[in-house]
A protein has these predicted regions:
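Extracellular/periplasmic periplasmic-binding protein-like sensory domains
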Residues: 232, 250-320, 334, 376-389
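Loop/turn elements at helix/coil->beta-strand transitions in domains of secreted/extracellular proteins
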Residues: 33, 71-74, 98-102, 121-126, ...
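Beta-alpha junction/loop-to-helix N-cap segments that form part of ligand/metal-binding clefts
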Residues: 27-32, 47-52, 62, 66-141, ...
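Periplasmic-binding protein-like
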Residues: 95-107, 127-129, 170-175, 232-242, ...
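Short, low-complexity disordered leader/linker segments with a strong preference
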Residues: 1-34, 65, 97, 388-390
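Segments of small-molecule ligand-sensing domains
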Residues: 305-316, 327-382
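Extracellular/periplasmic Venus flytrap/periplasmic-binding protein
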Residues: 90, 134-135, 142-255, 290-300
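Extracytoplasmic "Venus flytrap"
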Residues: 36-57, 79-86, 107-110, 177-182, ...
């Protein structure tokens, strides 16, 4: 942290689970309002979790510079769920016990879904900036929201591009076996097979499998799954999963000199993908939201974030807006009561860095544009005009 950040934002962070924390004046009527942040702050996905945390830090520091909320200073309590469902449960329970007004998180869909049951029992607003699995907002919980889109949306965009632009005929589909990865791969498969019927063009799934994830830094060998593709010769390999495994899969695909194009979803959108995958990542495709630089309202956020943290994380603006919604809802409600905050979030419109934010009855963001991206010259860039999905 810079000295400036130390002065404007208080972060209480532990690895794994939150230890017992003692605050002065943090109970009812105290001078602090606590906001929880949960994600994989260490480990293979640590970069993604830190990107999320930085977005919340910026929103909170700006809020405190304006005098806080309801005349009180906002404090962040951050928990490292290590991308593990059991840790997510522990973090959720500890955040609730510490009396947070709301939570920004988690990063992974399986962690967000696991934690949501606990947050719902306490009616604490939970806003995920990155969990795209549709099931998260289909549980019948009033208190869950997301500032990102869903896998059924990005799966359809990816499939439409693969079918109509790339003209693929043979596809291999892999996932990392997580709730997110399996769900995204299934949505892509469903969408691309649906394209067969009206166009009367046959798309064949030549292979479908789960790949082992990286554990304790050990690199899995994907050879037994990839070697059969040499004879199948797919036009496209689609992967549902995150950037650590994605980078390794891409490298091993290139090592076998397979001519297939490679496509994935939002969770590989991290600079670590290019660092780990190297030149093998050149020309790969993935779905994500529009570039922050192209968002008319995001200029101030972009400049402030770059000045404080340097590199802009892919989900930092989504976390920033999630925190913005949470803080503004406290201001509008005039209280930190969960029931009141949930009602406000469902009914109000919020001005975020990404533009106007409004949620539907399930807690999904009403406008969720996706763009197809690629890697060119070692950098991410959109390859297609923005596509609005309803």
């Amino acid at each position: 942290w810079t000295d400036k950040m130390k002065k404007t934002t208080t972060i209480l962070l532990t690895a794994g689970i939150l230890a017992s924390l003692v605050f002065s004046g943090c109970g009812p009527g105290g001078q602090q309002i606590k906001i929880g942040v949960a994600g994989p702050l260490t480990g293979e996905q640590g970069k993604a979790g830190q990107d999320l945390l930085h977005g919340v830090q910026l929103a909170v520091s700006e809020c405190n510079a304006r005098g806080g909320v309801l005349g009180k200073r906002v404090v962040i309590i951050a928990g490292d769920d290590r991308a593990d469902e059991k840790e997510a449960n522990a973090i959720a329970q500890r955040l609730c016990d510490q009396g947070v007004a709301g939570v920004v998180g988690h990063y992974n869909s399986h962690c967000s879904i696991a934690g949501s049951r606990i947050y719902n029992q306490r009616m604490i607003p939970q806003i995920t900036p990155s969990s795209t699995n549709p099931k998260f907002t289909q549980q019948g919980f009033d208190n869950v929201f997301r500032t990102c889109g869903r896998d059924d949306q990005q799966g359809r965009i990816a499939a439409d591009y693969a079918f109509n632009v790339m003209k693929v005929k043979k596809v291999a589909i892999f996932s990392d076996g997580t709730t997110y990865g399996l769900g995204l791969a299934e949505e892509f498969k469903k969408s691309i097979l649906l394209n067969n019927k009206p166009k009367k063009v046959e798309v064949t799934i030549v292979a479908e499998a789960q790949i082992p994830v990286i554990t304790e830094g050990k690199a899995p060998d994907y050879g037994p799954l990839l070697d059969p593709l040499i004879s199948y010769q797919p036009d496209l390999i689609y992967f549902g999963g995150s950037y650590p495994e994605g980078a390794m899969l891409i490298r091993q695909v290139k090592e076998r000199r397979l001519a297939a194009a490679f496509m994935s979803g939002d969770a590989i959108a991290n600079s670590e993908l290019i660092k780990r995958g190297g030149v093998a990542t050149e020309g790969i495709y993935f779905t994500f939201g529009p570039a922050v630089e192209d968002m008319p309202q995001a200029g101030r956020f972009y400049d402030s974030f770059k000045a404080r943290y340097g590199e802009l994380g892919p989900y930092s603006v989504y976390a920033y807006d999630a925190a913005t919604v949470l803080l503004k809802s406290i201001e509008l409600a005039g209280t930190t009561s969960g029931d009141s905050l949930v009602k406000v979030i469902h009914s109000a419109k919020f001005a975020g860095a990404m533009g106007e934010l409004e949620f539907d009855g399930n807690g999904d963001i009403k406008a969720a544009p996706y763009v197809l991206w690629t890697v060119k010259g070692g950098e991410f860039g959109p390859v297609k005009a923005e596509v609005q999905v309803q």
